[in-house]
Structure formats: structure tokens, C-alpha cells
Curated annotation (Swiss-Prot):
Pfam family of the protein (one): Rad21_Rec8
Main location: nucleus
Tissue: Low expression in shoots, buds, siliques, leaves and roots. Found in, but not limited to, actively dividing cells: in procambium, protoderm and ground meristem in roots, and in shoot and floral meristems.
Entry's family note: Belongs to the rad21 family.
Matching Gene3D superfamilies: Structural maintenance of chromosome 1. Chain E (1.10.10.580)
Function: May be involved in sister chromatid cohesion during mitosis.
Stretch list, region Disordered: 167-250, 262-361, 460-511, 545-573
Species per Swiss-Prot/TrEMBL record: Arabidopsis thaliana (Mouse-ear cress)
Keywords, sorted A to Z: Cell cycle, Cell division, Chromosome partition, Mitosis, Nucleus
The UniProt record lists the keyword rRNA-binding: no
Designated name of the protein: Sister chromatid cohesion 1 protein 3
Biased composition range(s): Low complexity: 316-325
Length: 693
């Protein structure tokens, strides 16, 4: 986790900035304006908890977007304010006359009395006037509706063309029932006539007159059966007409049986040729005439009268009321124009659901173009190919690289026998102590170091081996050991000059790190804790090996014969005291070190410490007792920063590791007040009881 949830939460101090860096489309204007940019930048640059560099970069991107949005909002507000100011203060000049700014009252005022009856709507057209918007019946009538045979019950339509051919202008029509006889059909129609009725030569007699106070009668020709060869025309006397037209003898009005057929003379010329005499009698009551609206009789065209054309079949026309009914029936007969029919309203369309808007980042990290280019040319994204080993030697080298920790335990030369291979194994030598050199084979040392003699006198019996004493090898550096030897040694014999260089540097190594350094110099590792006897007759080793007290890690060699410092170049005493050298190399035991526990099996407990850990414990005890006032902590704890001041990274890492070892054993306590701060070391009472001086 490289950031804290408390900082980047939605309601945290940097939550809005984090959202602006990733999902800035979801933020509102109020959220943008509520961010204080200087304070936010300070919180990012100097956070309460350390932030990763990646997190800080994301937050800075969010700050930039918030600042850009604020600039846009400010620019829009300024434009809006500028528009309002321009509208409020108009600077244009108007060059109009004085009275042009006001309209006259007449143009904006309605008249006081609005008489709608005086308006001319132009809709008082006559019924028989020529109208260009109306077609004739023949043009709009279908031809398949014409009957093909003669029917005694003939359907007649009262069309304008038929009326104009057969009826004079000032004639009212009345209807009587058809008197049916065998072989003929008589249709009588009474006309209202004047003082005299004059017969005509034609089969149709037209009589004109005025309306009588009682009734109106029209007389037409008698209609006979066209199938008879001899047709006679009879004149109906006035008395007979009067009796027929009396109120008590008014016949029942005949209703039209079929109005779907058009039987005009123009449609049936054959029927017009066969017909000879037509007699129609029409009567009408005056009361019905007064009650109904007076119809307007269209004028008769003279050309049609002179042409001699007659109606093929003319049934009685009724009263004005029946005429009005025929008007409705004729209107029903005529098919309406499909252009005038109102189209049905379309069904309401269901309202589509609003599509949810999807929010995406404005800029994508990898565009489609970039991905397609990488698929076509992946040279930029490919790394260098690692070749697999193709030979046994390369496989052997690869295996050695995978086992780096074990490579130094194997011989550099191949072809050794099993016994020689076992020599390079640590466990093999440690498991066979009888192969070590016994005490009888080693001669007695010629001289003993004064430092070791003083240690024996002070501490004759000690549960801890000599290697853990402050003056032992663990506590003294090689330079200090050489200094002690040079100070205590007497005059060196002349034959010892040949081995002076060999004696000034130790030939044995206590741990793997020193062995690795020796291998880098070109030497061979020494894995045996007890080296074989040296062949030089001028020095002997003071190894005291016991079968019951076998140490595998810490040992030291002291030459029996000392060397003269004047004969060794670079080893003269320059006047530096041992105390100053110890101050410079106070942590040298971390470089020499020992990783295995030190001590005999009888003296070791379950919490055995390594040589480095014990040396560090002794060092901390000495430093705590010698300089309690120099510590920077008021409680007297030691400061790890002061101890490692000026030391190398490798030495500091080892020091920290050994400190953790002591902490796990419960010998010391570590405390750190803040991250990346100083670490205080507090010595526990167990350190003074378990680790003896």
C-alpha cells in the first residue's frame, strides 16, 4: 500500500483532488470551487504521512485539472457579466422623428361596436350556378352499377341533369303510387295549370301556371309499358285531377327502393329509343308546401328541350320534403373524394427511455491507434532475447549461477577423488575430530603473550571461553594483536626475518566472509577449524585441542616467536596509543565475526548467541557504563545513529541485524518515535545477567 485511505477517501482532505485526477467528469461546479489550491498543494508536498511518488504525481494532476476548471468558470462568468452590462447600457443612437415612437390609436384599438351581421362572408352562391369544384354525376358514377334488364320496379335518381331535361323551371312535383295493371305501368302526375292547357305535339306536355290556394298540380304524360306496341295518350280531366289531389285522397308517398343505379338517358340510349309515351302525374299538398322550405327549381336548357331527348324512366318526384330526402340520398350515393377524408390520427408512440450517459476519462492511456501500431511493429515492446544454454558446459555454468551460495564449497579443479572432495565439506571434517592434531604432537609454545597471562591471572575459571573475553580475538583487531605482540616481544633472532611477512598477517579465517575475501586474492579456502601443522621450523602454533571441548568457529593463532618492529616496514610504533586505535576500530568485530554459537556444550544454554552477538552485547555494556552522559536520549538509552556515524553501509547492516538478534533474545529493547528517525537502544537486565564480562 503506497497511500493512506484516510487521505484519499471521498470525504478526506485529498479525496476531491484524487477524483479530479481520474473521474473529473463526475465532479460538480461546487466541488471544484470548494478546493483551496494553495492549501492542497501544501498538503501534497508536505504530507502528514509519507506518500509515494506515484501518488503525489496523481494528486498534482488533479490539482492542475481543478485549476483549469476554475479558470473556465471565471471566464464564463466574466462573459455573462459583460453581456448583462452591455444590455443594461445601450449606446446606440436612434434618429427617429418625434412622433414615430408612438403608434396611432386607430391601429391598435378595436371598434366599440362590432356588428358581425354586416360582414360579407361570400357564401351566398346559388345552387344552380356553375361551380368548377364540382363534377357531374356521369363523371363520378361507376359503369358497373347500370342494370342489364327491365325491372318493373325501376330505381330513379333525382339528379340535376334529369330535372333540367324533364321539368320546367316553375314546376313543383308530387308523387302518387304507381297503379299497376296487367302488361302496363301507369304513372300519373298532376300539374298545376293556368286558365288553359294546350296540348303539344310531343309526348310530354309542359303546362305552366301559378300556385292555387289549395294545392299545386302538375300534369305530365302518361307512362305506359314500353313493351306494348300501341301507346295512347290520355288527357286527365280537371275534375279527376281535383279529386285525385284533394286532401282526403292524397296517396301514400312511394319510397325509392334502389338508389344505387343511375338510369339517365345518356347512360341508356337503347331505352330512350324504345320509350314512346311517358305520363307522370304529380300532386302536392299546399300544407306540406307551406311547412317545408320552398325549393328552387333549376332552369331548363333550351337546347336540351329542342334536341327531343326524353327521360328513359321518370318516376314521381315527391314534395319538397321528399326532395330534400332525395338530396340526402343522392349525397349518400355519390362516393366522397378520398382526398377529403380525414386520416386517422397515428397511435401515440411510446416514449423512449433516456439513455444513461456513460462517463469516460477524456484522455485514454493507450489509444486504439497505439495498440494497433504495437501489434504491427512490436520492436519497441520486446526485450532482448536470452539464449538458453546449448552445451553441457553452459548448462553447468547456469547451474552454478543458480547455486551461488554453494559454489564456494566446491573445488575449483575437477578430477579429485572422493576423499579429496570430502575435505572441502564442512560437515565431514567436523564429524571426525580424531583426524585433528592431538596435544602430544604439538610442541610446547616458546613464549606466551603477556596479555593472555594477565587474563589467566585475573579470571582463572570462566564459564565463557577465552574467545569471548574483551581482550580475546573477538574483541581485538588484527592490528591490535600485532601491536600487543610487538610490545611484548623481545629481540628477534636473525633466522626469523625470512618469515616476518608471513607472521604479520593471519593465515586462518573465522567465517565465510573472510574466506571469500581470501578467495578473491587468489588463495584457497581453509574449512578445517584446526589447520594442519606448519612445516616452518622457526614457529609453532599454540592450539590446545581437546576432544571434549571442540570449537568449530572461534580460534586464534599466536606466533611463539615475536618479530622486531624495526625490521618490518610500515609497522613501526608512530606514538598512537591503543585507546585511540580502539576508538577508530570499535566495531571491528562485525567485520571478523562468527555466525555459530560460541562456548562449550556444557556452558551453552538454549539461547546461545553467536560470536558477533556476544561481542555486540559486550560493546553495548561497555559503552553504556563508560559514557552515560554522552547519549542524546534523556533516559540514558544508546543512540544507534551515533554508534553508526561515519560507518560503511555493510557495517551498519550487520550492526542492525545483530541488534535484532539481541532484541529477539530479550536482552535489549528498541524504540523509534517517528518513521525514518533515530532508534534508541535500551539495555535490559537480562543482558547483564546472561552475558558476563
Amino acid at each position: 500500500m503506497f497511500y493512506s485511505h484516510t487521505l484519499l477517501a471521498r470525504k478526506g482532505p485529498l479525496g476531491t483532488v484524487w477524483c479530479a485526477a481520474h473521474v473529473h467528469q463526475r465532479l460538480k461546479k461546487s466541488q471544484y470551487t470548494s478546493i483551496n489550491i494553495p492549501d492542497t498543494v501544501d498538503n501534497i508536498m508536505f504530507p502528514e504521512v509519507p506518500l509515494a511518488l506515484r501518488t503525489s504525481s496523481h494528486l498534482l494532476v488533479g490539482v492542475v485539472r481543478i485549476y483549469s476548471k476554475k479558470v473556465d468558470y471565471l471566464y464564463n462568468d466574466w462573459n455573462l457579466l459583460n453581456t448583462w452590462v452591455a444590455k443594461a447600457f445601450v449606446s446606440t443612437q436612434v434618429n427617429l422623428p418625434e412622433d414615430a415612437r408612438q403608434a396611432p390609436p386607430e391601429s391598435v384599438t378595436l371598434p366599440q361596436a362590432l356588428n358581425l351581421d354586416e360582414f360579407d362572408l361570400e357564401d351566398d352562391t346559388l345552387d344552380m350556378e356553375f361551380d368548377n369544384h364540382t363534377r357531374s354525376e356521369e363523371d363520378i358514377t361507376l359503369t358497373d352499377q347500370i342494370p342489364t334488364g327491365i325491372d318493373p320496379y325501376v330505381a330513379v335518381t333525382f339528379d340535376e341533369d334529369i330535372i333540367s331535361e324533364s321539368i320546367p323551371m316553375d314546376v313543383d312535383q308530387s308523387t302518387e303510387p304507381v297503379s299497376r295493371h296487367t302488361g302496363e305501368i301507369d304513372v300519373e302526375t298532376a300539374h298545376e295549370t293556368g286558365p288553359d292547357n294546350e296540348p303539344r305535339d310531343s309526348n310530354i306536355a309542359f303546362d305552366t301556371g301559378t300556385y292555387s290556394p289549395r294545392n299545386v298540380t302538375e300534369e305530365f304524360t302518361e307512362v305506359q309499358d314500353p313493351r306494348q306496341s300501341n301507346l295512347t295518350e290520355e288527357r286527365i280531366p280537371n275534375s279527376e285531377r281535383n279529386d285525385a289531389t284533394s286532401p282526403g285522397t292524397v296517396p301514400e308517398i312511394e319510397r325509392m327502393r334502389d338508389a344505387a343505379h343511375d338510369l339517365s338517358p345518356t347512360s341508356h340510349p337503347s331505352f330512350a329509343a324504345q320509350q314512346q309515351d311517358v305520363r307522370v302525374e304529380r300532386t302536392e299538398s299546399l300544407d306540406e308546401t307551406l311547412n317545408e322550405k320552398e325549393p328552387t327549381i333549376p332552369s331548363i336548357d333550351e337546347e336540351m328541350l329542342n334536341s327531343g331527348r326524353h327521360s328513359a324512366f321518370e318516376l314521381r318526384s315527391g314534395s319538397p320534403g321528399s326532395a330534400a330526402g332525395s338530396e340526402e340520398e343522392r349525397a349518400d350515393f355519390v362516393h366522397p373524394s378520398p382526398q377529403l377524408v380525414l386520416q386517422p390520427s397515428p397511435p401515440p408512440q411510446p416514449q423512449r427511455r433516456a439513455r444513461k450517459r456513460k462517463n469516460f476519462d477524456g484522455v485514454t492511456v493507450l489509444t486504439n491507434k497505439n495498440i494497433s501500431e504495437r501489434l504491427k511493429d512490436p520492436s519497441d515492446t520486446l526485450r532482448k532475447r536470452k539464449k538458453m544454454p546449448s552445451s553441457k558446459l553452459k548448462f553447468w555454468r547456469m547451474n552454478n549461477q543458480s547455486r551461488k551460495d554453494q559454489n564456494f564449497n566446491e573445488p575449483l579443479f575437477t578430477g579429485f577423488s572422493d576423499d579429496l572432495r570430502n575435505v572441502f565439506e564442512k560437515d565431514y571434517v567436523a564429524s571426525k575430530p580424531h583426524l585433528a592434531v592431538s596435544d602430544e604432537t604439538l610442541p610446547e609454545p616458546a613464549s606466551v603473550s603477556p596479555t593472555r597471562e594477565a587474563e589467566v591471572e585475573i579470571n582463572p575459571v570462566s564459564p565463557i571461553p577465552d574467545s569471548t573475553n574483551p581482550d580475546s580475538t573477538v574483541q581485538l583487531s588484527p592490528a591490535q594483536q600485532t601491536e600487543d605482540v610487538l610490545d611484548s616481544a623481545g629481540p628477534r633472532p636473525a633466522h626469523a626475518e625470512s618469515v616476518a611477512t608471513e607472521a604479520q598477517s593471519p593465515r586462518t579465517f573465522d567465517n565465510d566472509d573472510m574466506g571469500i575475501e581470501h578467495l578473491r586474492d587468489g588463495g584457497f579456502p581453509v574449512y578445517m577449524p584446526s589447520p594442519p601443522p606448519r612445516s616452518s621450523p622457526f614457529r609453532t602454533d599454540d592450539f590446545t585441542t581437546q576432544s571434549g571441548n571442540w570449537e568449530t568457529e572461534s580460534y586464534r593463532t599466536e606466533p611463539s616467536t615475536s618479530t622486531v618492529p624495526e625490521d618490518l616496514p610500515g609497522q613501526r610504533n608512530l606514538g598512537l596509543s591503543p585507546v585511540s586505535e580502539r576508538t577508530d576500530e570499535e566495531l571491528y568485530f562485525l567485520e571478523v565475526g562468527g555466525n555459530s554459537p560460541v562456548g562449550t556444550p556444557a556452558s551453552q544454554d538454549s539461547a546461545a548467541l553467536t560470536g558477533r552477538a556476544r561481542a555486540l552485547a559486550q560493546y553495548l555494556k561497555q559503552r553504556s557504563s563508560s559514557s552515560p552522559t554522552t547519549s542524546s536520549h534523556p533516559s540514558g538509552d544508546l543512540s544507534l545513529s551515533e554508534i553508526l556515524a561515519g560507518k560503511t553501509r555493510k557495517l551498519a547492516a550487520r550492526m542492525f541485524f545483530e541488534t535484532l538478534v539481541l532484541k529477539s533474545r530479550g536482552l535489549i529493547d528498541m524504540q523509534q518515535d517517528r518513521p525514518y528517525g533515530d532508534i534508541a537502544l535500551k539495555l535490559m537486565p537480562a543482558l547483564f545477567s546472561k552475558v558476563q564480562t
